[in-house]
Amino acid sequence: MDPGRVVFDSGVARRACPGGAQMLLFGGGGSANSGGFFRGVPAAVLGMDESRSSSSAAGAGAKRPFFTTHEELLEEEYYDEQAPEKKRRLTAEQVQMLERSFEEENKLEPERKTELARRLGMAPRQVAVWFQNRRARWKTKQLEHDFDRLKAAYDALAADHHALLSDNDRLRAQVISLTEKLQDKETSPSSATITTAAQEVDQPDEHTEAASTTGFATVDGALAAPPPGHQQPPHKDDLVSSGGTNDDGDGGAAVVVFDVTEGANDRLSCESAYFADAAEAYERDCAGHYALSSEEEDGGAVSDEGCSFDLPDAAAAAAAMFGAAGVVHHDAADDEEAQLGSWTAWFWS
């Protein structure tokens, strides 16, 4: 035996490893003429037959994951035991019953899973897998349905939004155009009015000039010409024209009678005021000095003081109305002439 070789008995390896695991042999190998690692070691010593090597390779390729539950291991063993030709699809009755159960409740409880498996003649794991796949398909369809519904709502809202934007633009354009037209209408009449007024101020028309000329002429004529029915104030010699003297030898006073009834209904003038003042002055002068001579001859009113004067009701009313309306002011010359007339009347009486 070559001292550079190590030979292990395969029987010892089988006894040490009941599962049939093989041990590595260090030393020479192969044939005596070969230069391999196991040079000079026959193949029978290695204890590796082809049948065991093939079965061990198949077992090594189907290694189980580390984190697995007991139920999963049992289910895997169940599926591994069934050959591909032995696996069968679900029948229509089983699918209908599973669908009805899923519609009632999409969550699968352990008791319910066991009951369904017993009634359908299926494995509990197979029922759980079917429910899991059906729930995934239901979620996908639900998402698709929600997506279609939301997309339709979005499209409707987008169409309404575009319609509102177009209406807004159209209404805004109308408002702008109407505002411009309104501003033009408000600006044009005001400018035309201002221009016309300026032209009228700068260039008065013929009617305005004629009216102004006529008005000035009328005012001048009214100031220059006496009013209608105006009479010149009587002269001092004519003051006693309507009166008479009574020389009956009894020392009676002469009576001056003023006839103011004539023209009482006409416009009151300065002469009416003058005669009224003269009558009042005469009444004051003759009061208490002379006695009434003849009531029949005079035909006038008799006062308590013995002075006779003729003032009819119409003249009295005219004098009262004239006093209420206001007396036309005379100038200084007319006042002096009236005073002189009153003194002359008193003197002749």
Curated annotation (Swiss-Prot):
What residue spans carry the region label Disordered?
A: 181-253
Gene Ontology molecular functions: DNA-binding transcription factor activity, RNA polymerase II-specific; sequence-specific DNA binding
Please describe the organ and tissue distribution of this protein's expression.
Expressed in seedlings, roots, leaves, nodes, internodes, flowers and embryo.
Q: Where is this region: Leucine-zipper?
A: 141-185
Of the GO CC terms on this record, one is:
nucleus
Q: Which CDD domains match?
A: homeodomain
Residue range(s) of DNA binding per entry: 83-142
* Low complexity bias spans: 188-198
GO BP, sorted A to Z: positive regulation of DNA-templated transcription
Q: What is this protein called?
A: Homeobox-leucine zipper protein HOX5
Source organism of this protein record = Oryza sativa subsp. japonica
